[in-house]
C-alpha cells in the first residue's frame, strides 16, 4: 500500500522504528478502514490494525494483505497487543500523535508500553495534505453530488 510506504519513509526521516496511530482519521489514512476503537501500529516492515470484536470481521475483509489484523478484548487489552507487535518487530523508538492524545493518555501509553513516545503528528499533517488519485476522485464525486443537490433545491430556495 502506497500510504504505508509514505508513512515508513517518514519514520525513517524521524529516526523512529514505528508509529502508534490512535487518531481515527490517521488510522483510516493508513489502512483504508474506518473504525472507532483500537489502534494501528506501523513499523518499518509491518503494519497492524488492532481492534475489538465489533470491527474484526469487516477489518479482515477490508484491509490489504500486508496489514495484520488482531483483536483485543476477551482478556487481552489493546496495550498488550501493541506491546506484542512491538516485540515481534523489535521496536525501540515509537512515535505517537501528540496532538491527538490527551496528556494523560500520552503518559499512560508510555507507562504501559515501557517506552518513551516521540512526537510525530506533523508526519500525518504533511502526508495527508497531499492527495492521492483515489482521494481526488472521491472529492470530485462529492463535489458533483453537492452541485446536483444544490441544483435540485435551488428553485425551492
Identify the function of each model-found stretch:
Residues 1-84, 142-149:
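N-terminal accessory/capping or targeting/presequence segment of soluble
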Amino acid at each position: 500500500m502506497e500510504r504505508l510506504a509514505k508513512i515508513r519513509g517518514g519514520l525513517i526521516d524521524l529516526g523512529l522504528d514505528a508509529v502508534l496511530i490512535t487518531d481515527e482519521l490517521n488510522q483510516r489514512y493508513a489502512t483504508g478502514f474506518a473504525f472507532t476503537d483500537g489502534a494501528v501500529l506501523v513499523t518499518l516492515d509491518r503494519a497492524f490494525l488492532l481492534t475489538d470484536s465489533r470491527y474484526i470481521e469487516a477489518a479482515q475483509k477490508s484491509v490489504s494483505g500486508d496489514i495484520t489484523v488482531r483483536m483485543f478484548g476477551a482478556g487481552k487489552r489493546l496495550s498488550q497487543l501493541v506491546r506484542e507487535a512491538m516485540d515481534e518487530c523489535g521496536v525501540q523508538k515509537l512515535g505517537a500523535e501528540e496532538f491527538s492524545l490527551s496528556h494523560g493518555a500520552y503518559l499512560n501509553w508510555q507507562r504501559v508500553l515501557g517506552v518513551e513516545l516521540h512526537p510525530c503528528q506533523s508526519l500525518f499533517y504533511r502526508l495527508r495534505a497531499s492527495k492521492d488519485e483515489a482521494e481526488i476522485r472521491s472529492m470530485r464525486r462529492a463535489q458533483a453530488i453537492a452541485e446536483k443537490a444544490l441544483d435540485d433545491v435551488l428553485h425551492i430556495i
